[in-house]
Amino acid sequence: MGQLNVLTGSKGEIR
């Protein structure tokens, strides 16, 4: 994705 995935919650991984 290349953007912050808010669905990850506290993780905030860039996918």
Swiss-Prot record:
Keyword Ribosomal protein assigned: no
Enzyme class: oxidoreductase
Keywords annotated in UniProt: Calcium, Cell wall, Heme, Hydrogen peroxide, Iron, Metal-binding, Oxidoreductase, Peroxidase, Secreted
Obligatory cofactor(s): Ca(2+); heme b
Keyword Ribosomal protein attached: no
Signal peptide from the UniProt entry: none
Entry GO CC: extracellular region
Function summary: Removal of H(2)O(2), oxidation of toxic reductants, biosynthesis and degradation of lignin, suberization, auxin catabolism, response to environmental stresses such as wounding, pathogen attack and oxidative stress. These functions might be dependent on each isozyme/isoform in each plant tissue.
Biological process according to GO: hydrogen peroxide catabolic process
Molecular function in Gene Ontology: lactoperoxidase activity; metal ion binding
Subcellular location: Secreted; Secreted, Cell wall
Recorded family membership: Belongs to the peroxidase family. Classical plant (class III) peroxidase subfamily.
E.C. code: 1.11.1.7
Name assigned to this protein: Peroxidase 3
The reaction(s) this protein catalyses: 2 a phenolic donor + H2O2 = 2 a phenolic radical donor + 2 H2O
Cofactor note: Binds 2 calcium ions per subunit. Binds 1 heme b (iron(II)-protoporphyrin IX) group per subunit.
